[in-house]
C-alpha cells in the first residue's frame, strides 16, 4: 500500500515569493530530457518546482525518503507517479510492478516506455530529494531511464548534490536544463518581497538587501530571520549577521536558540515527537503526540511558520522541511531519549491501523521492540514477501532474536524462503536443520511438511533428484489440503523429479495437476513453470505439435499476467526456438533465441549460454561456419567462466561437437572426449544428449565400435522410456556411424526408421545437420522411388534444406569452382574439349543435389522445357545416358576437387 503523501505535489502556500525569473527559465523544460535543480538544503527547490507545476495536469510527483533505496519500493512509487500523470495509461506496467513480475528496473522501464509511446502530449515526472538515493542499481536504472525516455517526457530531479545520472553527456548534447544554488539564491528584489509578506512592519530596501547579501540569498536563513523578527528576540539584521557564513550542517545551535527555545514546552514536545514521522496526518499525530485534534495542531504549526508543509491538495498529509525535520529528529534523540521507544511504538501502531505495515516495521525497528516486530511479521510478512520487500524482511528477521524465531516456526520458514529466493541454497538447509534440532515436536505435523516442501525445492535446484523426491512425497503426505502453496511446490518438485527420471507419463500428469492448482490459487510463476515442463515432456515423447500448443498456452499466460520479465520467460522462448529449429524454421528460431537473450539482458552473461547455443545451432543448420565459429568463441568463454547445470553443459557441448564434425577438427574432439563427463545413466533427454555428444565425437575419431555400443544402449533406453525424440536423434547418428563405417545396408535401414519416426516428430533440421552424407543417402532413396508417400515428401524437403544451406560446400558449380576444375590436371578430356556452359554446370549441380526437373526449373526461374534442353546438352557433353550416371559423374568431379562426398 502506497503512502498518498509521497505522490502528492506540495501545495503552493500563501505568502511565498513567486520566482518569476526561474519560472521563465523552466517554461521551456519540455524541450529537455532532464531538468536538474540542485542546491544545499533550504534554497527553495521544492517550492520553486511546486510553483512551476501549478496548473499542469500531465505531471507526476514522487517525494523520496530514506526508505526508497530499495529497488522494489522505488519502482512502486515511480510507476504510481507516472500513472498519476497519465491518468492510468500504463496499466500493463502497473500490473507488472504490483505483482513484481519484472526482471529488473531497466526492464520495467523498457515496458513503461513501450506504453508511453502511445502518449503524445507533454509529460513531466518530478523526483524530489534524489540525494537520498545511494543504491547504485537505482542510479544505473535511472541513467537507462534518461537515455531511453520518450521525447515528450521531461524528468525533473531535485537534489542536494549532483546525482549520478550521466549529467555530463546530457549537458554536451544540450538535453539538460540546470538550476543551481547560485540561481536559486534570492535576489535583493525577491528578499524585499519575502520580508514584506512575512513581517508586519516592512523593512527598508537597503536593509533588506544587506540582509540578503549577509546570507547569500539563502531562503531558509531569510525564513529564520523573519521568524526571529516576529518573535522579537533579535532585530532582523542581528539575526542575519549571526546566520552569515553558516550552512545547513551548522544550524543546530541556531535552531535551538531561535526556534525551539522560543516556543512553549507543549509545542516543543509536539515538534520533537511528530518529527519521527516521515509523513503525518491527523490520526498519526493524535496517536504519537497525544494531541486530541491532530489536524488542528498541524495547521497551527504551519501558521507559525515552523517549517511544516502540506503534501497534498486536501491538506490531509504534512511533512517537515527536510532540514528542520532532520534537526528535530536529532534533538528528539537527545531530549526525549527515554520516551523515544514508546513514541516509535505509537507510530507503528498507528501506521498498522492505517494499513501500512512497511512503515510500521520501520518504527518497530527504531523502537527496538522485538515483540511488536514479531507480531507485524506474523500478520504481514508473507504479503511483503510476495511483493518482493526482501531487503526490509531480511533486516526485520535479523532484528528478531533466535528464540523468537524458534517460538514462531512460520518465521523460520519465511527466512528460509527468503534465502531460497536469493539462491542461497546451502543456507536454507542449515537454517532448517538448526530449527528442527531446537524446536520441540517440529519433526511432525504441518510445519515440518512445509519445511520438507521447501527442502524438496532446494534439492531439485541442486540436482539431487532422490532427496527431492523423498522430501516432496513426505510433504504431500503430511500437508493438509488447505496448505495450497506448499502443496503446489511439492507437487511441482515431484513432477520434475519424475521428468528427470524418464517417467514421462507420470510426470506429465503431475505437472498438469500443478498447473491446475497454481491457476486456482493465482500462483502464476508455478503455473508458467508447469506449462514449460509439460512442453518439454511432450517434446521428449515426440508430440511436438502438442508441445507447440502447450507453449501457446504459456505465452497466453505470460501476456495475461504480465510475466514477460520473469527469467522463466527466457526458458519458454528458448524451447520454442528449439521446436522451430527442429522444423527447419531457422529465421524464427533465431529470432526466438535472440528474444530470450533480451529477456536476460539484466542478468549475468552466463545466463545466456543456452540461447547462445541455440543461435550457434541455427548457424550450423545453415552451414554458416564462420558465424558459428564467432559465436562459439563467446560460448566457450562463458563455459570457462561459470558454473552450470549438467544439461546446460550438454547443450553447449552439442554445438561444439557438431562444429568439429563439420570442420573435421579431430584434435578438438579427442581433447574434449578425454575430459568430458560420462554420466552413469541415460534415462532422460538431458543425459541422452550428453551420451550422444560422446558418440558423435567417437564417430568423428573413427571409434565406431564404442560409439555403436553407446548408441545401441541409448536406443534401448529411449524405447523403454518412450523418449521418441531422442530415439529419432539416436537413429540419425547411428545412420552416420554405419555410413562412415561402410555398412550401407545398415545405414539405409536405420535411416528408413528415422524417416518413419519423423512423421511423428516432424524432424527436419536434425537430418539437415548431417550434411552431404545424409543428402547422398536421401538422393538414392528418392531415386529408388520405394519410400511411402509421407517419407518421400519429407526426404525431398530435407534434401531441399540441405541444398539450400549446404550446397556451396559440395554441389554448387559456380564460376570459380568451374575455373579451378577445368585447370585441374586430372579433368576428363571430354569436359575440356566440349565444356559445359555456366547454366549447364548449375543444372548439373542441382541434379546431383537431388532436384527434379520441375524443382530445377523453379530454382533457376526458367521453363521446364528449357531445363530439358539443358539436361540433354549436358548429358551429351558428359557422355552419359541417364540421371544416375550424371550424378555419379558429378560425384567423381567433386572427389577429384577434394570434397569428401
Swiss-Prot record:
Protein name in UniProt: HTH-type transcriptional regulator MalT
Free-text activity regulation comment from the record: Activated by ATP and maltotriose, which are both required for DNA binding.
Top-rank taxon, per record: Bacteria
Similarity annotation: Belongs to the MalT family.
Subunit composition and interactions: Monomer in solution. Oligomerizes to an active state in the presence of the positive effectors ATP and maltotriose.
Stated role: Positively regulates the transcription of the maltose regulon whose gene products are responsible for uptake and catabolism of malto-oligosaccharides. Specifically binds to the promoter region of its target genes, recognizing a short DNA motif called the MalT box.
HAMAP family: HTH_type_MalT (MF_01247)
Native species: Shigella flexneri serotype 5b (strain 8401)
HTH luxR-type domain location: 829-894
GO biological process: positive regulation of carbohydrate metabolic process; positive regulation of DNA-templated transcription
GO molecular function: ATP binding; DNA binding; DNA-binding transcription factor activity
Residues that bind ATP: 39-46
Annotation: DNA-binding region: 853-872
InterPro entries: P-loop_NTPase (IPR027417), Sig_transdc_resp-reg_C-effctor (IPR016032), TPR-like_helical_dom_sf (IPR011990), TPR_MalT (IPR041617), Tscrpt_reg_HTH_MalT (IPR023768), Tscrpt_reg_LuxR_C (IPR000792), WH-like_DNA-bd_sf (IPR036388)
Keywords carried by this UniProt record: Activator, ATP-binding, Carbohydrate metabolism, DNA-binding, Nucleotide-binding, Transcription, Transcription regulation
Amino acid at each position: 500500500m502506497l503512502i498518498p503523501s509521497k505522490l502528492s505535489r506540495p501545495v503552493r502556500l500563501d505568502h511565498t515569493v513567486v520566482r518569476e525569473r526561474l519560472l521563465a527559465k523552466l517554461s521551456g523544460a519540455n524541450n529537455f530530457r532532464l531538468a536538474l535543480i540542485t542546491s544545499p538544503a533550504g534554497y527553495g527547490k521544492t517550492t520553486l518546482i511546486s510553483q512551476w507545476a501549478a496548473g499542469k495536469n500531465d505531471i507526476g510527483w514522487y517525494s523520496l525518503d530514506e526508505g526508497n533505496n530499495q529497488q522494489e519500493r522505488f519502482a512502486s512509487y515511480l510507476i504510481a507517479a507516472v500513472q498519476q500523470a497519465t491518468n492510468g495509461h500504463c496499466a500493463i506496467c502497473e500490473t507488472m510492478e504490483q505483482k513484481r513480475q519484472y526482471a529488473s528496473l531497466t526492464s520495467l522501464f523498457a515496458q513503461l516506455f513501450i506504453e508511453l509511446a502511445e502518449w503524445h502530449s507533454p509529460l513531466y515526472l518530478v523526483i524530489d530529494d534524489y540525494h537520498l538515493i545511494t543504491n547504485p542499481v537505482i542510479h544505473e536504472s535511472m541513467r537507462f531511464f534518461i537515455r531511453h525516455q520518450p521525447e515528450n517526457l521531461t524528468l525533473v530531479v531535485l537534489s542536494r548534490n549532483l546525482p549520478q545520472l550521466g549529467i555530463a553527456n546530457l549537458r554536451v548534447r544540450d538535453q539538460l536544463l540546470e538550476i543551481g544554488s547560485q540561481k536559486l539564491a534570492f535576489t535583493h528584489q525577491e528578499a524585499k518581497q519575502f520580508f514584506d509578506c512575512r513581517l508586519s512592519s516592512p523593512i527598508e530596501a537597503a536593509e533588506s538587501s544587506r540582509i540578503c547579501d549577509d546570507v547569500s540569498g539563502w531562503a531558509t536563513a531569510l525564513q529564520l530571520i523573519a521568524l526571529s523578527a516576529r518573535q522579537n528576540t533579535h532585530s532582523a539584521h542581528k539575526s542575519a549577521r549571526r546566520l552569515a557564513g553558516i550552512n545547513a550542517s551548522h544550524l543546530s545551535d541556531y535552531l535551538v536558540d531561535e526556534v525551539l527555545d522560543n516556543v512553549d514546552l507543549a509545542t516543543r514536545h509536539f515538534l520533537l515527537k511528530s518529527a519521527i514521522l516521515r509523513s503525518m496526518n491527523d490520526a498519526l499525530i493524535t496517536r504519537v503526540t497525544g494531541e486530541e485534534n491532530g489536524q488542528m495542531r498541524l495547521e497551527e504549526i504551519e501558521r507559525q511558520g515552523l517549517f511544516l508543509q502540506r503534501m497534498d491538495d486536501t491538506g490531509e498529509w504534512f511533512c517537515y522541511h527536510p532540514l528542520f525535520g532532520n534537526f528535530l529528529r536529532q534533538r528528539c534523540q537527545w531530549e526525549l531519549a527515554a520516551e523515544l521507544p514508546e513514541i516509535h511504538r505509537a507510530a507503528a501502531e498507528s501506521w498498522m491501523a492505517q494499513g501500512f505495515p512497511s512503515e510500521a516495521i520501520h518504527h518497530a525497528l527504531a523502537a527496538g521492540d522485538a515483540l511488536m516486530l514479531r507480531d507485524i511479521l506474523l500478520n504481514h510478512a508473507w504479503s511483503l514477501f510476495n511483493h518482493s520487500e526482501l531487503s526490509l524482511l531480511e533486516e526485520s528477521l535479523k532484528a528478531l532474536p533466535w528464540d523468537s524465531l524458534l517460538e514462531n516456526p512460520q518465521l523460520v520458514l519465511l527466512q528460509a524462503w527468503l534465502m531460497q529466493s536469493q539462491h542461497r541454497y546451502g543456507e536454507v538447509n542449515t537454517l532448517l536443520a538448526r530449527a528442527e534440532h531446537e524446536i520441540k515436536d517440529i519433526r511432525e505435523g504441518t510445519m515440518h511438511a512445509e519445511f520438507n516442501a521447501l527442502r524438496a525445492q532446494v534439492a531439485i535446484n541442486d540436482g539431487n533428484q532422490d532427496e527431492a523426491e523423498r522430501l516432496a512425497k513426505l510433504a504431500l503426505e503430511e500437508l493438509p489440503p488447505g496448505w495450497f502453496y506448499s502443496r503446489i511446490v511439492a507437487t511441482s518438485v515431484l513432477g520434475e523429479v519424475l521428468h528427470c527420471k524418464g517417467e514421462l507419463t507420470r510426470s506429465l500428469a503431475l505437472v498438469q495437476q500443478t498447473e491446475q492448482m497454481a491457476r486456482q490459487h493465482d500462483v502464476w510463476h508455478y503455473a508458467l513453470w508447469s506449462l514449460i515442463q509439460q512442453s518439454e515432456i511432450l517434446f521428449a515423447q515426440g508430440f511436438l505439435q502438442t508441445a507447440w500448443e502447450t507453449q501457446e498456452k504459456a505465452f497466453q499466460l505470460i501476456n495475461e499476467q504480465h510475466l514477460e520479465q520473469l527469467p522463466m520467460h527466457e526458458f519458454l522462448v528458448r524451447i520454442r526456438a528449439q521446436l522451430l529449429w527442429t522444423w527447419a524454421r531457422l529465421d524464427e528460431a533465431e529470432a526466438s533465441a535472440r528474444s530470450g537473450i533480451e529477456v536476460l539482458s539484466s542478468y549475468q552473461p552466463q545466463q545466456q549460454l543456452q540461447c547462445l547455443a541455440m543461435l550457434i545451432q541455427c548457424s550450423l543448420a545453415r552451414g554458416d561456419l564462420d558465424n558459428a565459429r564467432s559465436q562459439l568463441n563467446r560460448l566457450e568463454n562463458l563455459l570457462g567462466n561459470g558454473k552450470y547445470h549438467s544439461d546446460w553443459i550438454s547443450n553447449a557441448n552439442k554445438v561444439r561437437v557438431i562444429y568439429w564434425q563439420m570442420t573435421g577438427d579431430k584434435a578438438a574432439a579427442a581433447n574434449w572426449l578425454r575430459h568430458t563427463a560420462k554420466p552413469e545413466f541415460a534415462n532422460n533427454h538431458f543425459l541422452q544428449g550428453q551420451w550422444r555428444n560422446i558418440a558423435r565425437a567417437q564417430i568423428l575419431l573413427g571409434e565406431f565400435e564404442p560409439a555403436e555400443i553407446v548408441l545401441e544402449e541409448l536406443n534401448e533406453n529411449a524405447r523403454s522410456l518412450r523418449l521418441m525424440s531422442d530415439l529419432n536423434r539416436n537413429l540419425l547418428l547411428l545412420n552416420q556411424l554405419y555410413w562412415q563405417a561402410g555398412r550401407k545396408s545398415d545405414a539405409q535401414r536405420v535411416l528408413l526408421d528415422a524417416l518413419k519416426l519423423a512423421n511423428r516428430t516432424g524432424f527436419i533440421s536434425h537430418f539437415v545437420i548431417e550434411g552431404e552424407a545424409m543428402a547422398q543417402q536421401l538422393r538414392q532413396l528418392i531415386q529408388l522411388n520405394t519410400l511411402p508417400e509421407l517419407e518421400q515428401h519429407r526426404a525431398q524437403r530435407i534434401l531441399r534444406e540441405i541444398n539450400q544451406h549446404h550446397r556451396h560446400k559440395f554441389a554448387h558449380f559456380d564460376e570459380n569452382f568451374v575455373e579451378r576444375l577445368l585447370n585441374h590436371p586430372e579433368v576428363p578430356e571430354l569436359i575440356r574439349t566440349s565444356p559445359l556452359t555456366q547454366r549447364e554446370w548449375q543444372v548439373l549441380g542441382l541434379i546431383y543435389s537431388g532436384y527434379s526437373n520441375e524443382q530445377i526449373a523453379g530454382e533457376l526461374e526458367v521453363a521446364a522445357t528449357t531445363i530439358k534442353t539443358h539436361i540433354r546438352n549436358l548429358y551429351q557433353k558428359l557422355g552419359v545416358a541417364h540421371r544416375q550416371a550424371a550424378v555419379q559423374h558429378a560425384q567423381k568431379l567433386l572427389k577429384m576437387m577434394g570434397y569428401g562426398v
